[in-house]
């Protein structure tokens, strides 16, 4: 069990905090029977900032607060921009190109910095799945901000009441931007994958098509071994998770039972990402299906589409990895 889930004090606190805050926003969705998806974005903001906090869970409360707030504002802006430029293929591709090189050149940096950039880019990609005008884009970013800030506030309150020893020195940071050959090839390869995925999503006007570039973003690592592991875990976790998520999405109609499942899967999703990517994806698949079900979206159709788009994203990454190996060989001969 310890191979798949982390149940140390810091992890449990993050999992419980995320469950409480996401539970609060989603219970409002249930009780008030809201017909909009703004509550979903508040829950999403909470969830993503919780994932970011995983990488800084052993730092001081002060550092986690400052780093968390900075990250929150950046990711809220990113999701707003993604929503606004979601149908603008050229602008969206240029922004993804910029993110690709930021991710590529900071991949060898400190996890706080590298993961922060990665999750901000992830929020931009998620935003592209919700086409909106200026007003709605701002509202999407605002509710994301509210949900994330609520998480940080609750987390800080809990941490101040519980004594936890800091394992890391806050003064030590390894923020490096390395435009070497390996990082450049990785950035170019990642940008190619993201742009292809984004093109497929926008050109064919696919509902939740953003899942294709998002899959590329999350499984494409700087080296083949890590990418292969991420591909395997992503595929297996999504397939097994879908076997549970799809029947739940079809047959469950009681909003309160759906909410309870969402509450539980939130906790396990946060605790699993620390230990095992595959188990994280398994619980994430169920989490997403239940979250969308509460937002009056088709959890079944989206879960099935998500499985298909995950496979497409994996095929894109695998193809580019094979091609980039040949490019790397040619460049090293020059």
Question: At which residue positions do the language-model features occur?
Answer:
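Alpha-helical transmembrane segments and their membrane-interface boundaries
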Residues: 1-283, 291-334
